[in-house]
UniProtKB/Swiss-Prot annotation:
Gene: Mst57Db
Predominant location: secreted
Signal sequence, start to end: 1-17
Superkingdom of origin: Eukaryota
Tissue: Lumen fluid of male accessory glands, becomes seminal fluid.
Keywords, alphabetical: Behavior, Secreted, Signal
One GO cellular component term: extracellular space
Known function: Transferred from male to female during mating and may affect egglaying and behavior after mating.
Name this polypeptide is given: Accessory gland-specific peptide 57Db
Any one of the GO BP annotations: egg-laying behavior
Cell compartments where the protein resides: Secreted
Organism of provenance: Drosophila melanogaster (Fruit fly)
High-level lineage: Eukaryota, Metazoa, Ecdysozoa, Arthropoda, Hexapoda
Amino acid sequence: MKITSALVLLFAGVAFAQSADPNTNENKNVIHINSPSAAK
């Protein structure tokens, strides 16, 4: 259980760090995929 909770906290921390920095490549890819203009 400790290992599972540690992994959850790790992924949550990474996701929060990426969401806090809009200039990361990960967020650019997500925004591009989810943007309406990308579907055109």
